[in-house]
UniProtKB/Swiss-Prot annotation:
PANTHER family assigned: 40S RIBOSOMAL PROTEIN S3A
Quaternary structure, from the entry: Component of the small ribosomal subunit. Mature ribosomes consist of a small (40S) and a large (60S) subunit. The 40S subunit contains about 33 different proteins and 1 molecule of RNA (18S). The 60S subunit contains about 49 different proteins and 3 molecules of RNA (28S, 5.8S and 5S).
Localization: Cytoplasm
Protein known as: Small ribosomal subunit protein eS1
Gene for this chain: rps3a
């Protein structure tokens, strides 16, 4: 075969020489994720986003991003089976300001509670907070042996199950309906709702392991920057610095479409 006739060899050589390896991380920026003021630890971590290029704005790629965080990390606590979902609602500088988006229990906690010889009682209810957030709350509880009981099973009768379920729904509705989202989250952190249900149902059938196992966000009111700033302790500067023990920058009080005025002289 004549020299220079092998097209595949020459083609491959040219292509290999031209190809440049571009590091994808060179086009990206790191943003800090900030939790609302209800939690002790405000610095959740960092998130990555592609830099602003033409009409594609970086902050638009961050808005609506959901972070799932263990309550132990948010409260510097030992109780790690409760997970909170936080959604990015606004970006101020290099900070992503988040808001409550849901709550869940870990799979291993749920599985550890389900056992033989007891009745599992579940209830769910859709409730609206005073500030217009529509939440769906799921509750779970388990029957337990009475103090002087000899029999190994502790099954509740169907009528008792219905009474307990009714009580669960009543308490969940009452606790959410009369409060705004901030107060509801403050009740979910120690799960005071579950303790109230356990106490109220004691007369029907003794319960244990009563938890609000899940909270879903169904509807939100129209986004207001002022309300988000309130949740973050007026711009998320002073409160965050105290809670996380590091400097998080100055107070931010700019509107969403803010543009600095044009200066005559530089």
């Amino acid at each position: 075969m004549a020299v220079g006739k092998n097209k595949r060899l020459t083609k491959g050589g040219k292509k290999g020489a031209k190809k440049k390896i571009v590091d994808p991380f060179s086009k990206k920026d790191w943003y800090d994720v900030k939790a609302p003021a209800m939690f002790n630890i405000r610095n959740l971590g960092k998130t990555l986003v592609t830099r602003t290029q033409g009409t594609k704005i970086a902050s638009d790629g961050l808005k609506g991003r959901v972070f799932e965080v263990s309550l132990a990390d948010l409260q510097n606590d030992e109780v790690a089976f409760r997970k909170f979902k936080l959604i990015t609602e606004d970006v101020q500088g290099k900070n992503c300001l988040t808001n409550f988006h849901g709550m869940d229990l870990t799979r291993d906690k749920m599985c550890s509670m389900v056992k033989k010889w007891q009745t599992m009682i579940e209830a769910h209810v859709d409730v609206k907070t005073t500030d217009g957030y529509l939440l769906r709350l799921f509750c779970v509880g388990f029957t337990k042996k009475r103090n002087n009981q000899v029999r190994k099973t502790s099954y509740a009768q169907h009528q008792q199950v219905r009474q307990i379920r009714k009580k669960m729904m009543e308490i969940m509705t009452r606790e959410v309906q009369t409060n705004d989202l901030k107060e509801v989250v403050n009740k979910l952190i120690p799960d005071s709702v579950g303790k109230d249900i356990e106490k109220a149902c004691q007369s029907i059938y003794p319960l244990h392991d009563v938890y609000v196992r899940k909270v879903k966000m169904l509807k939100k009111p129209k986004f207001e920057l002022g309300k988000l700033m309130e949740l973050h302790g007026e711009g998320g500067a002073g409160g965050a610095a105290k809670a996380s023990g590091d400097d998080t920058g100055a107070k931010v009080e700019r509107a969403d479409g803010y543009e600095p005025p044009i200066q005559e002289t530089v």
